[in-house]
Amino acid sequence: MIKELRIISGPVSISQFNLNRLRENDPQILTACPNPPPEAVKAGKAIPVPMGEFSIDIILDKLPSDFYPDLVQMSARNMHFMPRGLDKLTCPKVMKIGDTFHWGDESLSGMIRYCQSFDCDYHWVYQGVQHLHFFVEAGLKNVFWLPGTPVIEHYVPQKKEAKSYDIIFRGSQSSLHVYRSNLLKFLQDNGVKIDISRKPYLESLEDYSKSRIVLNCGLNGDTNRRIFEVLMAGGLLLTDRLSPQSGLFSLFEEGVHLECYDSENELLDKIEFYLKHPEQAEKIAIAGHQKLIDCYSQQAIQQKLYRYILQGEIEPPFRLEHDTRVLHINQPIDEKKFVIRLKIYELIQEIHRLNSRIKLLYWKGRNKELLSDLADLPRLDITYANTTEALADVKTWCSKVEVKDQVQLQSLPLELTGGKQFQMVMVDLPDKLLSIKELLVEIEPQLPESGFLLVVGKATIFTKVMLSILARWSGLLPIRICAANSHHQLGVGACLVYQKLTRPSQAHLVKSTPKLFVPKLSLKAKVSQGLSSLPLVNWTKTLIRNSGLIKN
């Protein structure tokens, strides 16, 4: 019998403890967590530990005499939960990683720092699989991934009955889910009778099995829990189409086990089709459910985890075979460049979370690794533009790491159709100050009104000042972008961000380009976007223009 010690930062409900007598092949699990249920403590299934930093001796002193763990599993969830002295345990230590798309301490870079502080033997990613290459590049040991079914509670769908719903969505709508909320509103505005609510876990699963179509819209291009919950319940899953690096299409086949959409119109078309063809919808739902039960059930994934940790055996694609970027990491890494890439990715990932589609131009860039980093954001349309000679190296790189279908390469001069089309333009910080003015002249035609310029690189104070002066002459205001509902500034030390204020005489050229919704802007950025009609804001806008900082 395998004995597992779990050290968890969050509260664990009584339903997550198996208080019954174990079956022959069941693992014996002991959970150390803050405020465990008294029944679990009494049954010898839990050990209470404090929040924050504490010594592992608290756990070791309370281990049953017949229990020494075969492995210890932790979770990178609360960055302030710091058990110390794990080296006193001689068994393998495993760090479980998920939700890699937040900010602050729980950001991608924050999780990497947290994992590095423990130096675990294995690192298991169950959500945010597209970020595996960052963990490998950061030097974490034995990074692998497995489907997230072990983090959800088991459910067996009841006998099939008549469908109660045509299409449903069960989940959150908030300021953190702007894209999702807009998508749901789009469906309602177009006459789709979708049942939207947030219900308890079990009730949601029951509804999944009673609906002809279950809509999923992940938070930020990740394989979220709802994917596995819907398939476990036997519903037809209609989910946003993710990148190959997400791992979704290494597990399931589109059109066979689930269905996907890439745009609002495609979503409408597929809803209409499957409501008119319920037999095909049911066929896919049955196949998806069976695939999950046969290959990715909680028990099956738990056994895969134990087999790898304790016996060193793991089958493709879970050893990262699905993401070729992992195979082309240059060691030793340049730590400064790595941190810059991480921060740029986190900034653009946060903007990606809020928008249905983003068009980004990387102008004459030298950072091909950054280019392939960004390729896994499914709603980010990337164009890389450079001379024919420079394109050859980037084309080779994109083919090598298998992102060539996710990045459009264009040689200069850039020919645009339909006017200015890029909401964001990204450039590298010039090596020489004399090159800044020339660079701004080059990219000016590519930026529409309210478009954003990202200058990638760590700039000195003098360079920042000079760049800001020249940028203002080009109608670009320096801004700061913060994460939603926070004062956490994104991209600090990795890039400078500017927003384009188009001259009135040029406004007719840019009306077709959609504006980006960004998490949080400085006052100047809000003024330039016209996000507020308050008299104070209008007065401020006039004051700024009259000051000569912006040329009319």
PLM feature spans:
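Nucleotide-sugar donor-binding catalytic core of glycosyltransferases
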Residues: 1-62, 66-67, 71-88, 92-254, ...
